[in-house]
Amino acid sequence: KEAVNNINKKKKELQNTLLKGMPVLIKDITDVKGVRTTYGSKIFSNHIPLDSDLVVKTVESRGGVVLGKTNIPEFAAGSHTYNDLFGTTKNPWNLSLSAGGSSGGSAAALATGMAWFATGTDLGGSLRNPASWCGVVGLRPTPGLIPQGPSKTSFSNLSVNGPMARNVTDLSIFLDALVDHNNRDPLSYKKDVGSYHKNLNCYSDKFFSIGYTEDFGIFPCDKEVRDMTKNTVKLLENLGHNVNVEYPNMEAAEESFQILRAYLFYSAYDFLLDEDEKLIKEEVLWNIKKGQKLNVNKLKKADKIRNTIYQETLDFFDKYDFLIAPSSIVPPFNLNEPWVKKVENNIFNNYVSWLMIAGCVSLTSCPSIAISTSFSENGAPIGIQIIAPPHQEEKLLSFVKTIEDALNISNMIPKDIN
């Protein structure tokens, strides 16, 4: 009711904005002034922010009206959306399965038609994984394209905010609304292209050179996901693109990512160590304490590895226009499991390792769009991430639109919402 009242009060004013009063859902890790924002934690169950995040301010300045908050795992840690405050977000296509995370609430809300636009955040696939599992579209942009914060970790570019929508066309509109230059974000920069929406078809008649991988040569991967990736590659070849098995070397990616992620968690959430540990999810505590134990030599090594990966990824893009990989190594899993423990013959001893096919891409600062390309045996969507060189969101969106058009599944909706 409050959102509708806001729209009615500002009808004339909103008509001159980009979003014209369209409702927008905000992930519950992001502050909205005067709106309960819990971060998925009992500790913040009654938290009312005094100010909004830059993402929200940008949305509202472009005519978006905040409709509500979407569910997350506690402190957005993990790729399965559940917490002790609001319970578990179910996959709209199969209610016994996970919607992914940590932007699972946003993805599920979009899939069920609650809104056209929702925000997500992505550290290690938190936006991409749920998008592909719920049959929607999500973009992890080049760091700095969308201003965010202020936060304790404003100078880190590992976690970014990004748009989520039901299809690529809507995604391009929402990206236009989110992009801005704001000095409050030290990584923010002025984009050098026009409207992503107006230019959405500017590469639609082009043929591209594409590298692809099912596993980067190192990650385990479920057979259903491997088959889906192969079938997507066949589709791209039928569309006239040149596709080869080639990809940057990610052998050391997990070592770097785990260290940098732990440092980020300790920097952002060290204060939680003074709280009652019974109120904090085990995985969150593990990540914070891992960061607490880091020394400068480990951080130095992590940065060196990341720099090497970045340079080798740019070398890859000297030869190829895009890189394609699965957005997740498994289809959506059982709702009652906290995280994936085993794939093929690999056993994971922490909640991060199974996400590394997305996490390794985060290290590159490259934009990546997740899109569903098929359905698993249990009836839930599965899909790929399409990765472009830094700052090439326009080209990336245009290319992914051609894939979406060829697949012709973006207008499908889960039967459960009826």
Regions found by a protein language model. Name each.
Residues N6-K9, Y189-Y196, D303-Q311, N350-Y351:
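Short gly/ser/thr-rich secondary-structure transition/capping motifs
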